[in-house]
Amino acid sequence: MAELIHSTIGRLLEQTADAYPDRDAVVYPDRNIRYTYAQFDSLCRQTAKGLMRMGIGKGDHVAIWASNISEWLAVQFATAKIGAVLVTVNTNYQAHELDYLLKQSDAAALIIMDSYRGTSYPDIVNSLIPELQEAKPGQLKSERYPFLKTLIYIGNKRLSGMYHWDDTEILAKTVTDAELEERMNSLDKDNVINMQYTSGTTGFPKGVMLTHFNVINNAANIAECMALTSQDRMCIPVPFFHCFGCVLGVLACVSVGAAMIPVQEFDPVTVLKTVEKEKCTVLHGVPTMFIAELHHPDFDAYDLSTLRTGIMAGSPCPSEVMKAVIERMGMKDITIAYGQTEASPVITQTRANDSFIRRVETTGRALPHTEVKIVEPGTCQEVQRGMQGELCTRGYHVMKGYYKDKDATRKAINHDGWLFTGDLAVMDEDGYCRITGRLKDMLIRGGENIYPREIEEFLYQHPAVLDVQVVGVPDAKFGEEAAAWIKLKDGKSVSPDELKAYCKGKIARHKIPRYVIFTDDYPMTASGKIQKYKLREKTIEMFNLSSSQ
């Protein structure tokens, strides 16, 4: 077990650049971008100096609203070098969500790209901040956002009231190496360096405050569990704005000197092409991404023989999908990670050398230097091994707290430092965990507790089912009933009654879904988490069920 790293993100990148100056750090094959670690650290230093000259101070909150572009990576490490707090913004946000985040985060700066999937970011920003039209770059005075002074635009034109990205390079020349060093030397490993907003699968997002120490060590432990080395080349199709991208992807690579090959926007063909062209050895993804890749009609046309490992995480990982990834994609050492943003994010992970069964059927065991226990929900009383309860964790990875929300922080972390995840789990005698559901997802039908994950795993075995999500909906007689939202495999068909008949005699009668709905897509957050509360709302509306029944 490696020792904990007592450093800052900026220093970590420097150390890696010193150790592997000529190795690939960042590669965008479609944009003809290829930085070695020495070049990448130089770019991040330049960006850091530019941000300093733009007036970004230590502790200032810098929001970035962009997809997986190279500038995002430069900002991640530049803000870390100058002690600013990186606030990540979901690429799918519209005006309402951006307004909430800018207010709640007290952002001093906002960096935007031009557009994402048809949404013009400058149009949204100008609608929220009319003062930009008369403002000088770096001198915004907004009634709505009193902290916000600086906007930076990444695009091919200049916009009123905003710096252009190229200005970071120009202004960097007016800041000396000594000034940057002085700033870096003033930083502490326990400074908050990142605010990730929870994905909003249940309500208003909360700003999770993470430190250098939190994320560096989580990333290094993740890399250790995967047996990641400087020889590896990681394809990163998961979004940078989520911990999956910027910690399990970016920081894990930097911790060992591996190459990062990001995909700007997820598309299964782009991922398959990237893996083949860049001979990637590592591929990350949420289950829906792997499903899309495996079921693409041209899947067999791509050479994926270099793939060795990766992480499947972000939502429950169906065992059938894991088996297909191992057998058809050749990812023999793939691992499953489980966690949440509040834990930097990984809590448990399978190891590359774990048995096939453990890597397919569990979410692994606690990361090094962390503790995990399963407790009776609503208490701190630990349950016996093999019994279900709420998963709690303690260690270096637990967040500093929710920004401006002490009440929510107190509810999440007790006085002994245990983080209560809200996830139901079972731990075996060897410490391996299985996530069995969310406390909030559990439904009670006629006094019987039903866990959606159990029904989902069963329905995955049906030959026509590609994906399935089960939610609880109100029922006048039983209190709640199960509703299954099904995605079918191409060319396959099955009726709701046939699916119910398939369940009879194989799972308990009270677990058989009362409602079966077929769909092509699930409502998702941009980080790939399925928004079950929206499926519940849709079911209630479709079947005219009363939410108060």
Curated annotation (Swiss-Prot):
Residue numbers binding ATP: 198-206, 423, 438, 529
Source taxon at top rank: Bacteria
Enzyme class name: ligase
UniProt keyword list: ATP-binding, Ligase, Nucleotide-binding
A single GO molecular function term of this UniProt record: ATP binding
GO BP term, pick one: fatty acid metabolic process
Enzyme Commission number(s) of this protein: 6.2.1.-
Record InterPro entries: AMP-bd_C, AMP-bd_C_sf, AMP-binding_CS, AMP-dep_synth/lig_dom
Family: Belongs to the ATP-dependent AMP-binding enzyme family.
Protein name in the entry: Putative acyl-CoA synthetase YngI
Originating organism: Bacillus subtilis (strain 168)
Originating gene: yngI
